[in-house]
Amino acid sequence: MSVAAAGRGFASSLSSPQIRRIALKEAKLTPHIWAALHWNLGLRLVPSVRVGILVLLIFLPSTFCDIGSVYNSSYETVIPERLPGKGGKDPGGKVSYMLLMQGQKQLLHLEVKGHYPENNFPVYSYHNGILRQEMPLLSQDCHYEGYMEGVPGSFVSVNICSGLRGVLIKEETSYGIEPMLSSKNFEHVLYTMEHQPVVSCSVTPKDSPGDTSHPPRSRKPDDLLVLTDWWSHTKYVEMFVVVNHQRFQMWGSNINETVQAVMDIIALANSFTRGINTEVVLVGLEIWTEGDPIEVPVDLQTTLRNFNFWRQEKLVGRVRHDVAHLIVGHRPGENEGQAFLRGACSGEFAAAVEAFHHEDVLLFAALMAHELGHNLGIQHDHPTCTCGPKHFCLMGEKIGKDSGFSNCSSDHFLRFLHDHRGACLLDEPGRQSRMRRAANCGNGVVEDLEECDCGSDCDSHPCCSPTCTLKEGAQCSEGLCCYNCTFKKKGSLCRPAEDVCDLPEYCDGSTQECPANSYMQDGTQCDRIYYCLGGWCKNPDKQCSRIYGYPARSAPEECYISVNTKANRFGNCGHPTSANFRYETCSDEDVFCGKLVCTDVRYLPKVKPLHSLLQVPYGEDWCWSMDAYNITDVPDDGDVQSGTFCAPNKVCMEYICTGRGVLQYNCEPQEMCHGNGVCNNFKHCHCDAGFAPPDCSSPGNGGSVDSGPVGKPADRHLSLSFLAEESPDDKMEDEEVNLKVMVLVVPIFLVVLLCCLMLIAYLWSEVQEVVSPPSSSESSSSSSWSDSDSQ
């Protein structure tokens, strides 16, 4: 039973006249929300977790190695000694190391891990706003796995390039090993791993907990044979990964390091997916080196929606993939990630987002594998699911490093293969050595030495030739700062502010691309009492007007109390979970953080699948709420948005009214910007007009080091008119609008003119009648009276 179906039961307490169903349809996909990390749970490892669990610490980037941050109870310095092969020969993919652990010599036998990594994937990055293909220097054959000689149940998984970095399991104790960067003697740190954190997932599966495992459906013998055949063969998930700008900076703004780190993460995720006989293959990587082309707010629900739109528009036609995952670097508050259930192999919803705001690769890879499981149709486990001796099932609400797929996960995955025929997972990717892909002129992507790429529209393109070179005299071919094949003037406005919390960007006169989108730092005050988040002022009045149109506004407190204390799908502070089968009732302090309740509604919105509206009488008006829980439009438009004001110095975050410190606002504009500007999302000053960046202390035209140079007021006025006729398409649209206006206005003008002429004619006839000369008899009479008087 779906979440919406379960909600209908809870809504039955409302009287039917009060519930006016606008639309209600079943959908097939569901977004998943992840909760925050909990740092107080211990981890005790057992031998059976060898492959799937602890491999994930293998590739901790050495630049982020911080022994004080590792959950360890003790550590020692060791010097691994690589042993030569028998007879001095290279064993070919095999290597042995000797090291001293706790006073005892341990011999490690390792073998290169087969099949992974795939080395023929394209790597894209941006240079002056132009998408280009990179060829980073990558280490190959770095990932080795093996065992300790003479230690039953032992397991070793390490990266041997640039020292040993990874995990060793001995007698149910897990050890981490990392090289010491300052050592000249190949010294390493070996430490025991304890008290590892877990990720908690609080989202309800699409089916009720009692039905999650699903009784076996009656299948035809042929179906069973097909499923058995599918299960016995390795499945391949072709994954495209995107790294956002902040995470790229956390990897030292180094493309080589970022690529290697992503390859390592994918390799480690494979140690989980082996449990369902599936291999993740990296088919492409894009690094947002110059800023994020989409809005990436704290709320990952919005990020998932924005990323999926970007994926459909920019990626689908460029690189074939079964799923695409976005890795972001910021702390997302209560959420750790988002994924579409059953999204793999679908062109519309093959997306997920994960937050990697720490350096615990182990936990992050577990989260990635969990979300990938949802992409593959695997729902959350319930208490009756089993996953062997592991402490946590990977698809349970508690996701730990000691995790694995359960029997329920296998059943869900089998049904996904059956329902979707598993076509996209059964294609084995080609095994080729990694090489730079030759530029493919005409694919719409600027590659290698291409100056432009007009795709299939080269014949009519004014700037780019079919040979992917700029035409004679052209400086550029596309971009917000390119007009008529030339760069726009320095200081021209290229992206105006969309909200009071957004900031404008300007062209620098030397490139065709507009600078990355910038906005006021999350937590900046707006509209008197509200706060900015992701470039938008989280004002509930504005949210109501966006849904219902003007003059809708946020309802009074009585409406919020009446609606959000019902604990049904029209009013709640949280959806059901497998631990709690009911909707959450909003407490008094959280009542403004549940469903958005609006009043003064004059127009009903165009509803979407699975949307319903509720109206509750309030005085002479109505209070309106919306149940918009579905997968094609996340986040739920009916919920109060994260970051919305709920009490003095407090904001809503995951249905809870909490301190505004969760927005991580750390700007002091009076000090940093000398009171002449605000802080942007890059934590730089955006100066008011009349002051210059970087600190707004000297005269200038305003802006920031991120926004591009701001033109003088006269230039900005010209750039606005420049924007108004930026392209021939815009001109055509304007001409069409003008033509339509003329068609409407001219007849009206003619009618009015005709009426005026008729009125003038009528008035003129009346005037003529009044002033017309007297008749002859009247003249004679008048004349006789005159004679009489004279006598």
UniProtKB/Swiss-Prot annotation:
Active site: 371
Protein origin, superkingdom: Eukaryota
Disulfide bonds: 345-424, 385-408, 387-393, 494-514, 667-679, 673-685, 687-696
UniProt note on tissues of expression: Testis.
GO BP, sorted A to Z: binding of sperm to zona pellucida; fusion of sperm to egg plasma membrane involved in single fertilization; proteolysis
Keywords per UniProt: Disulfide bond, EGF-like domain, Glycoprotein, Hydrolase, Membrane, Metal-binding, Metalloprotease, Protease, Signal, Transmembrane, Transmembrane helix, Zinc
Residue numbers spanned by region Disordered: 201-220, 772-791
Cytoplasmic-facing ranges: 762-791
Domain EGF-like per the UniProt entry, residue ranges: 663-697
Main location: membrane
Domain Disintegrin: start-end pairs: 438-522
GO cellular component: membrane; membrane raft
Binding site for Zn(2+): 370, 374, 380
SMART domains xrefs: ACR, DISIN
Known glycosylation sites: 72, 256, 407, 484, 630
A Pfam family: Reprolysin
Residues annotated as transmembrane: 741-761
Signal peptide residues on this chain, from the entry's feature table: 1-65
Membrane topology type: Single-pass type I membrane protein
GO molecular function per UniProt: metal ion binding; metalloendopeptidase activity; metallopeptidase activity
Described function: May be involved in sperm-egg fusion.
Name used for this protein in its record: Disintegrin and metalloproteinase domain-containing protein 1a
Organism (species): Mus musculus (Mouse)
